[in-house]
Amino acid sequence: MKRALLISGGGSWGAFGGGTLARLNRSYNTVVGVSTGSLLAPLAALNEWELLKEGYTNVSNSDIFDNYWYMQTPLSKSGRLRKLPIIISLILGDKSICTSNALRNTIDKFFPEYYFIELNRQHKEILVGTQNYFQVPSKIHYFSSANEKYEDFKDWMWCSANFPFFTSLVKKSWKDYNGNYHVGLWSDGGITDLVGLDQLMYKDYKEIDIVLHRTKNIEKYEGNKINNLVENVTTSINAMRYDIEFEYFFEKIKNLNVGGSKVTIYWLPRKLSKNSMVFNQEEMTKWWEEGYETALDENRIQVFGPIKS
């Protein structure tokens, strides 16, 4: 029986999804990830839960960012904006307020080549989605572990996990369906595609699990206090994402149901923090454990059964 897993973006909230997946401990033929989902995907496909837990509970901000655009304070777990580096970045005309080469090195650490080889040996496919901003309008592309070389695939994971404005925009060439090479400017795959449902259409998956780093009752942004530029940008992006993402989300699930697939969504029980771009080890450890403990909680699970014709 073919089974697939889709994992959404969510930054540090990926620790909660990782704990949930560790509790489920299922085998999947295909795993599709965008943003933080692309980082979870390879080890989740191989059921390497201890290493995945280490990655999502022991990383710090220095493992993600090359320079800090905020600093944590005893009174605020979401951090306080560091204005000077942002002002300097704006004056210099940088594409983002910081870079994330440290994240690329962290991917090297937690996804060594023998795991990539093992994925292919077990015939498991990982698809990671990343957005090309050189295309107008910008377009998401999915890159497969079955078709990419090891170093290139890690680059695509990195591209997928880079949030616009905050982290690196990566310039990298890519090959189209006709074999022609083009140069792209890549960033977060989760901006316009929630979990990559289109990648599973017409492929006869009997069971599809979706780990969403969102709450079932979509948060309303009206009335939220916005303290600075960063919060303004993240709030605006998230508001637009909800409009784009959920407009066709359940319609696509229905299409999968008609095709004979059972779809199970695992939602967050609540909004975990104000800013998912803050990587706090203590908080992420708690989220991993809570994700593990509540994985089978009926309030988190939404099931859509196959529709018989």
Regions found by a protein language model. Give the residues of each.
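Patatin-like phospholipase
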Residues: M1-V34, P42-S309
